[in-house]
């Protein structure tokens, strides 16, 4: 994990928040590369969920909601973790992460005596208005799903969708975690990508299995190494109070396999609870003429897909990070590689760090590099870049030797480098260098955009 953290700080992916004041523990800011990567992941998810399905629409619900939403959902009374404190060093731990989580047990930090277990509510509270009275108490949402449930009827009435249909949302959530650790894996402020799919009660198992397959295929599509992922099915005693079934997609992070995304069959729990406590009718009347009158009116069941956007950023960085040794023969701009563990590679080559991100996710798609900063090559390179910048995320780099510039682009995952040289002035061609293989192609300036689109469309990670 140290290498990932170092790369993120060095190349502008993630910074400690409020760093000039010493930083705020467990809170992070996303730099130029980080926000671009995060936005690209969110865009890919949004397209996969909404554009590729006729029956899924989007929503952006408020962070601050009526407190009764959280009372009804059970968060006010039950959204808590077991907590123990050390009576000596005052450290706090989740009870399930301590060897002896009971009063008098040893503190894993200093060996002092621990307190007994108590429940710690994970919701942040705030107040709306000029007073701090209980009547003005609000909560920062701990999840985005409830905003979808309370808008279910609004969406149904304004879109004329029919069951089965889904509502997708990307947004921030907040949890007052007892322990924040493992970089951006577990933080107090994070972003979720969730979709709630409303189905007939008799079809919940079918759609649960369908969305399990769809979500696995998403990560496969964007080049994640499948041998680093696995499914974990929740046993009956692990299921949340609302769930009929649950499966997690886990990824092999540096600290071990951890949850990346969950798919849950929530049954009709959420809509039924909100109907009871709000007094509103949230039943659906199915227009299918093949159903009898009694079966046509029901509360839909919900199949949920819930992914952490910030965890996805970390996962894609970990999965893409590669170290390899580069051998440079005496051929202009040519490079060959040996894997980092190949015998003799470290003695004879230079190590490069490369992020093998899918081109659709990379913060920069193509970098334009004039061979030298004279003879009009800089202006020509800028002109070629300007022809493509509306369609691709472009960078321009004229500082330093060409090999150093390649390395900088490798480290941030740029899949294509376009070198403009003296031949470019003669025949209007450029050299396109491919990140993963370091192979080079001479491409006509007129066909450069089409070449890049084709490479992106047919990209396969080596």
Swiss-Prot record:
Pfam families in UniProt: HGTP_anticodon, tRNA-synt_2b
Binding residues annotated for substrate, in chain numbering: 94, 143, 190-194, 304-308
InterPro entries: aa-tRNA-synt_IIb (IPR002314), aa-tRNA-synth_II (IPR006195), aa-tRNA-synth_II/BPL/LPL (IPR045864), Anticodon-bd (IPR004154), Anticodon-bd_dom_sf (IPR036621), Gly-tRNA_synthase/POLG2 (IPR027031), Gly_tRNA_ligase_bac (IPR022961), GlyRS-like_core (IPR033731)
GO cellular component, one term: cytoplasm
Gene Ontology molecular functions: ATP binding; glycine-tRNA ligase activity; protein dimerization activity
Residue positions binding ATP: 175-177, 185-190, 259-260, 308-311
EC number: 6.1.1.14
Cross-referenced CDD domains: GlyRS-like_core, GlyRS_anticodon
Cellular localization per UniProt: Cytoplasm
SUPFAM superfamilies given in the database record: Class II aaRS ABD-related, Class II aaRS and biotin synthetases
Top EC class, one word: ligase
GO biological process, one term: glycyl-tRNA aminoacylation
UniProt catalytic activity: tRNA(Gly) + glycine + ATP = glycyl-tRNA(Gly) + AMP + diphosphate
UniProt keyword annotations, A-Z: Aminoacyl-tRNA synthetase, ATP-binding, Cytoplasm, Ligase, Nucleotide-binding, Protein biosynthesis
Main location: cytoplasm
Family statement drawn from the similarity comment of this UniProt entry: Belongs to the class-II aminoacyl-tRNA synthetase family.
Quaternary assembly: Homodimer.
Function: Catalyzes the attachment of glycine to tRNA(Gly).
The protein, known as: Glycine--tRNA ligase
Species the sequence originates in: Treponema pallidum (strain Nichols)
